Amino acid sequence: MSRFLLCSFALVLLYPTAIDLYLVGLPQIASDLNASESQLHIAFSVYLAGMATTMLFAGKIADSVGRKPIAVVGAMIFVLASFLGGMAEQPNTFLIARFCQGIGAGSCYVVAFAILRDTLDDERRAKVLSMLNGITCIIPVIAPVIGHLIMLKFPWPSLFTTMAGMGILVSVLAIFVLKESLPSQQGEEQTTPESHQETFFERFFISRLIITALGVTTILTFVNASPIVVMSMLGFDRGGYSSIMAGTAMISMLISFSAPLALGIFKQRTLMMTSQVLLACAAIVLSAAHFHDGQSHYYVFGLGLICAGFACGFGVAMSQALSPFSQQAGVASSLLGIAQVCSSAFYIWFMGFIGVSALNMLVFILVLGSVISLALILLIPKPVHDTHYEEIPSAT
């Protein structure tokens, strides 16, 4: 079991690392490639596009040929794309490399969640996903610091060499440590009643897909809006901003690592509702601080509530979304990932397009997400009568 957890954690970490590690090098990258920083900021959207376009195919193939081949191929694509990004001399080449990095990271991301669905029951999976969320929350803080330290001695291509090195490590784990977790009966004719009951159009899966998509949209809007709120509105410098973000990351980690203990005491539904209440409270605090000229610590408190709310319920919601699918976990993971990436990218783009301020953008998604998610949690509870929801198929 430990090998599955180790490999799943490593596969997931490629996704946030490739987003955050290179950001400190953007000014130098823009200078060397004769491009503006605003032009290179599109690399974030290109990276997400690469993830989204490959997720569905990766999940479907993983359900057919196995998790391990997709993990190995995805990690190798990530390695090659990272080397290409470091060697880029033109903006277009750089964007192509970022798109290909998204392909590799997206493949690994899908496989990681499919492996956890294959090998863990519902209760353990909820705990593991909560802990995994805590680990990924620290990447946005650690990665820029590591990138800064690297660039003190080396030029910006070394950032992509570091990403390639991480991809090589993941490739080694996928080849030599990871065992195939695809259910052994997956390659045979599916005639069992359970296999026919697995549909992606059921209310429960769609409700959890919406909840997780709104959650990721909220946290990515927070990441996108926080520099403007903290530095432009509140007047903090980069050092102050880094300290605040480090504090919010610590909150996310503490809540995420406490969630497994909480799940031993409270029901999953309780944690999910608590999560949405915290996000709604964050919207109230931020709005009150804005309209009543609140001091900076009120804003910081609101930002902390966002991280606490997301960390409290996201792992549980992801676990519940995957629970109906013992035979199609790869496709289920793909659909969840695509919904999360596309909803986040569209919301941030659309709000920017119509000229909504960063704070209003954040408050709106907090209100919208918490209201919709609370309604779905109350109206569509987790089924308790379907035994196949908790089926953990034997792995080959």
From Swiss-Prot:
Highest taxon of the source? Bacteria
Against PROSITE patterns, the record matches this protein to:
MFS, SUGAR_TRANSPORT_1
The principal localisation class reads: membrane
Q: Which residues lie on this side of the membrane: Cytoplasmic?
A: 1-3, 63-68, 116-131, 179-209, 267-270, 319-335, 382-396
Name the keywords, alphabetized.
Cell inner membrane, Cell membrane, Membrane, Transmembrane, Transmembrane helix, Transport
User: What is one GO cellular-component annotation here?
Assistant: plasma membrane
Q: Which GO terms describe its molecular function?
A: transmembrane transporter activity
Q: Which residues cross the membrane?
A: 4-24, 42-62, 69-89, 95-115, 132-152, 158-178, 210-230, 246-266, 271-291, 298-318, 336-356, 361-381
Protein localization: Cell inner membrane
Topology with respect to the bilayer: Multi-pass membrane protein
Write down the InterPro entries for this protein, in alphabetical order. MFS, MFS_dom, MFS_trans_sf, Multidrug-R_MdtL, Sugar_transporter_CS
So which stretches are on the Periplasmic side? 25-41, 90-94, 153-157, 231-245, 292-297, 357-360
Q: Name one Pfam family in it.
A: MFS_1
The record's family statement is: Belongs to the major facilitator superfamily. DHA1 family. MdtL (TC 2.A.1.2.22) subfamily.
NCBIfam families named among the record's database cross-references: PRK10473.1
Descriptive protein name = Multidrug resistance protein MdtL
